[in-house]
Amino acid sequence: MGQTVTTPLSLTLEHWGDVQRIASNQSVEVKKRRRVTFCPAEWPTFDVGWPQDGTFNLDIILQVKSKVFSPGPHGHPDQVPYIVTWEAIAYEPPSWVKPFVSPKLSLSPTAPILPSGPSTQPPPRSALYPALTPSIKPRPSKPQVLSDNGGPLIDLLTEDPPPYGEQGPSSPDGDGDREEATYTSEIPAPSPMVSRLRGKRDPPAADSTTSRAFPLRLGGNGQLQYWPFSSSDLYNWKNNNPSFSEDPGKLTALIESVLTTHQPTWDDCQQLLGTLLTGEEKQRVLLEARKAVRGNDGRPTQLPNEVNSAFPLERPDWDYTTPEGRNHLVLYRQLLLAGLQNAGRSPTNLAKVKGITQGPNESPSAFLERLKEAYRRYTPYDPEDHGQETSVSMSFIWQSAPDIGRKLERLEDLKSKTLRDLVREAEKIFNKRETPEEREERFRRETEENEERRRAEDEQREKERDRRRQREMSKLLATVVTGQRQDRQGGERKRPQLDKDQCAYCKEKGHWAKDCPKKPRGPRGPRPQTSLLTLDD
């Protein structure tokens, strides 16, 4: 009652400050809300075994990382900072994570020295795992392999087997020796699948450049044993990666990983190249690899004997059980990798580099990786070279997304900024972008504001139109009323008033109208008589 279960997700959320510090060391920035979304909702859908509460298992983390870094529409660039941070926590766990991480197993030497003489110690009975040994009836005289003290059982397929007990004293009649021989002869030989499982489980040693997951391994009899590649491995590598012509960088990285982890022989390398490359691509790679052979002076050589000795085209007689043979194989793999890198370079084409632009939802870190890959593929320059940092930085600024590029150009003291500083600033700008929900909400709000403003403007224009009509109608009515008043005043016009000494007839002053000399003086004519009609008329 009252107890809570601690999970990797809840543990990282409780120590979120440390998580942000680890993310900052990886030149990325993470947000708690997105981490809570990706871990339980997004990553379990990748079908790689990711639990909803998270895990610190590096195998599962690397599988999720491969899904996140997938090219094209299948990738998830917005999740890159979060899976990179999670990987860093699992790879170098802080103190609060160590109790929840399974302890790393001690690794055996990758290139063991073969025994030169008879050993005084009794050889181990088998190099197999207990799960693969046949069921043998235990003998009371022999100590048990697993203790009965109630301790936790190991994973029989993925963990190293426990040490066998010391050999008891042999019986005088030699029966014990015969039983020992029978016990050893009944154990089957190691299988390739067991080596693959153990190779995937055990990480490489920090101070070694080789891995335990190679086809050459030390068997139970003290001899190196060889298992070739499985057909399923070759099939998956070919179908889950682009061709060499389409993306030489990615396929080169895959082959480099295989050469490092599996330590293949000369025949394995030919099988690998024949599966992943076309005939023309393979010939080009072999030619470039032979060009990379160096002589005793450290410079490239064209002497046929030295070239054929270091990188033969026909099957050599290298014995991988001897140090000399293993050294030949190491040099051959290094030259093969150099040939892949040189053959993957295309003719110089800066237009291809300028055509690499940041996608709308692509993180700056993923965009920088694509930009560097374009430099490696289409130019003779190494983007990791310090002398090319300025060119890569300028391309990163100019070819970033418009909103990120504008803000990067306005940074203070831009000339002193390193490429890492620019990526850090770009990540901050990228993470401050709106989420799709916030962007939709902003668009909806802006649409409503525009509609409201448009309605207000329409109402204002309508009111202005009404006022203009009213003014025009007022002017028209005023004109009509004024005209009517003038007409009415014109019909009732009175005679002008006369002065006291002014004539009403001639309008001259000094006399009146009866004395006006201009007025005619003749007798008046008789007035016409008005006749009245009677009823008889």
UniProtKB/Swiss-Prot annotation:
Modified residues (Phosphoserine): S191
Interaction with host UBE2I: region residues: 429-434
The protein's name in its UniProt record: Gag polyprotein
Gene3D superfamilies named among the record's database cross-references: Gamma-retroviral matrix domain, Human Immunodeficiency Virus Type 1 Capsid Protein, Zinc finger, CCHC-type
One annotated GO molecular function: zinc ion binding
Segments of this protein annotated with the region Interaction with host PIAS4: 344-392
Gene name as annotated: gag
Motif (PPXY motif): 161-164
Motif extent (LYPX(n)L motif): 128-132
Compositionally biased residues, Basic and acidic residues: 433-474, 485-518
Any one annotated GO CC term: host multivesicular body
